Amino acid sequence: MQFTALLAALGAPLALAASIPAAAHNHSMIDVQLAATGNSMIKATITNTGDRTLNLLKFNTIMDEHPTRKVMVYQDGAEVQFTGMLPRYKMSDLTPEYFVNLGPKASVEHSFDLAATHDLSRGGKIVVKAHGMVPTAEENATTITGHTLYESNELTMDVDGKQAAAVEQAMGGDDSTGVIDKRSNIVTSSCRGSQLRVLQTALSNASRLSRAAASAAQRNPSKMREYFKTADSRTVQKVASRFLSVARESSSGSTGRTTYYCNDNRGGCHPGVLAYTLPSKNQVFNCPSYYQLPALNNRCHGQDQATTTLHELTHNPAVVTPFCEDLGYGYQRVSALPASKAIQNADTYSLFANGM
């Protein structure tokens, strides 16, 4: 995967990001066009449609360089299984390499192979589209101050299944084996030093926070409207049920449905990643930076081990169905999501639990 910077009008190089008021970030300031460049290859062209420079954070967007969920893929009206990773990124201490500077009317291209993160072995016609929210920072800065939305064109492709099946899966490989702990199926042989104790504490705290959040969802309609944008009975029931499912998984005695690793063995712990999930396998992996987080954060909406574990468990279809995605990060982005997306956003659940 690679970024290819395109020249802006008059051939000027990409400028540094300009200051953009956060209030102006609720609409789309970028255009995303998808094009097929091979059997399962996609080229995404991202264009700044405005008259000011944008500083775009790549995490969990169409520009993410890692095997994350960049697009939705459908075949015969059903979603094609995603086999890539769903990471939780550390949102503090961001550095410039996590951003793309995009001048007015300038574009960048990002290419990726769908077959590396989707099972396309069946072959045939597929439909691909992308949508999301890109966090933005101000000029010469790395503090997130706003966001912009995007929605791509709908692309139809005819895939050769045999050719797609020959593409190496980005997060593939045989399932690891090891000694399993009874709680949430922790692979204890993956833990070093105090990591097992830290993870067990995080799971215990995640269970406690999830039960409290389930109760708050049922008793505090104003908080439901703040985070999930509605307090109707159906949404309340669904949110509470999901929190209780996370609580059960976090405290399971011997029936855990996820497999949790203290350390990464699939190469997904890229810079900035706290932990990640493989939803196709119901597996969660902690990264070294996870152990630098506090067990619990007293700062409202601050990241910690407990809510990171809670966040990752919502990515697992064995716990939450359909599993939650990464549609918005941080309180400002979460609070901008409509109800239909808030309920499917992993960070909405972790922030709600942290804020109770």
Curated annotation (Swiss-Prot):
Binding site residues for Zn(2+): 311, 315, 326
Protein name in UniProt: Probable neutral protease 2 homolog ARB_04769
Primary residence: secreted
Lineage: Eukaryota, Fungi, Dikarya, Ascomycota, Pezizomycotina
Gene3D superfamilies: 2.60.40.2970, Collagenase (Catalytic Domain) (3.40.390.10)
Residues of the propeptide: 18-183
A single Gene Ontology CC term: extracellular region
PROSITE patterns noted in UniProt: ZINC_PROTEASE
Entry annotated with the keyword Zinc-finger: no
Catalytic activities: Preferential cleavage of bonds with hydrophobic residues in P1'. Also 3-Asn-|-Gln-4 and 8-Gly-|-Ser-9 bonds in insulin B chain
Catalytic residues (positions): 312
Residues glycosylated per entry: 205
One annotated GO biological process: proteolysis
UniProt-listed SUPFAM superfamilies: Metalloproteases ('zincins'), catalytic domain
Role this protein plays: Probable secreted metalloprotease that shows high activities on basic nuclear substrates such as histone and protamine. May be involved in virulence.
Necessary cofactors: Zn(2+)
The protein's Enzyme Commission number: 3.4.24.39
Entry's localization field: Secreted
A UniProt-annotated Pfam family: Peptidase_M35
Organism this protein belongs to: Arthroderma benhamiae (strain ATCC MYA-4681 / CBS 112371)
Gene Ontology MF terms in the entry: metal ion binding; metalloendopeptidase activity
Keywords: Cleavage on pair of basic residues, Disulfide bond, Glycoprotein, Hydrolase, Metal-binding, Metalloprotease, Protease, Secreted, Signal, Virulence, Zinc, Zymogen
Claim: Chloroplast is one of the keywords in the record: no
Signal sequence interval, chain numbering: 1-17
